[in-house]
Design a protein with these regions (language model features):
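Adenine nucleotide-associated cytosolic modules
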Residues: 1-251
Length: 251
């Protein structure tokens, strides 16, 4: 860590829970962010600002006018430009001292496994169940911590899932790939609610990477109308085909 790094990250280095050792861990880490929408854009901003050494930004979509209500990396001038490229540009302006990789593609199959294998933490910021299940399967197979979130209307949810998956995985809670009837596309979403959830994904990643204990194996539910939180303990599903021990499918 050089003098420039020390000055840039000084406000979090002052924290006893992070300090120089924790900051160096962040600088040495790689985070994969899949999905650069209402969750992924605030998460990416805070992780870049915090000095996570390598960020891999994956999204195959372009910026649309309807995105601008909540996807805070983008401006009106970015409409029809690839989200991953715009994100790379903006985050480079914020922090040119970190490594940024833009993947203008939908990560599936071997490409997904390869990206997950290189990451210390994966942020699932996607918006469909099939992709979430595929990300979860790859993370469990490769023992990579997964931080997943979603939001619709005034509500959000967040989970931190870590090896050895004693509290289960995403598949344990949602055993199929069918999207819920109520989601961002059908029910709408309040911008700050999805921003809260994406920001919390970044916070949990910083805690994991810097060695701060974080509550894993919980489903955390946020009600934006009442500003209240609820936490539900997760349980490993018997015979889960992804993490269910001897009953798991081979990968």
């Amino acid at each position: 860590m050089n003098d420039r790094d020390f000055m840039r990250y000084s406000r979090q280095i002052l924290l006893d829970d992070i300090a120089l050792d924790g900051q160096q861990k962040l600088l040495d880490s790689q985070v994969l962010i899949i999905g650069l929408g209402g969750l992924g854009t605030p998460a990416a901003l805070y992780l870049a600002g915090a000095g996570v050494g390598t960020l891999v930004l994956a999204d195959d979509d372009d910026v649309h006018l309807s995105n601008l209500q909540r996807q805070i990396l983008f401006t009106t001038e970015d409409i029809d430009r690839p989200k991953s490229q715009v994100s790379h540009q903006r985050l480079t302006q914020l922090n040119p001292d970190i490594q940024l990789t833009a993947l203008q593609q939908r990560l599936t199959s071997e490409a997904l496994k390869d990206a997950v294998a290189r990451a210390d933490v994966v942020l699932d910021c996607t918006d469909n169940m099939a992709t979430r299940q595929e990300i979860n399967t790859a993370c469990v197979a490769l023992n990579t911590p997964l931080i997943t979130a979603s939001a619709a209307g005034f509500g959000g949810q967040l989970m931190v899932l870590t090896p050895p998956w004693e509290q289960g995985c995403y598949r344990c809670l949602w055993p199929d790939t069918q999207d819920p009837e109520r989601n961002c596309r059908t029910a709408g979403v309040v911008g700050p609610v999805v921003g809260v959830m994406g920001t919390l994904q970044a916070l949990e990643a910083i805690k994991l990477l810097s060695g701060i204990e974080t509550p894993a194996g919980e489903l955390r539910l946020f009600d934006g109308k009442s500003s209240q939180w609820r936490s539900l303990a997760l349980r490993r599903a018997t015979g889960c085909p992804v993490c269910g021990g001897s009953n798991a499918d081979p990968v």
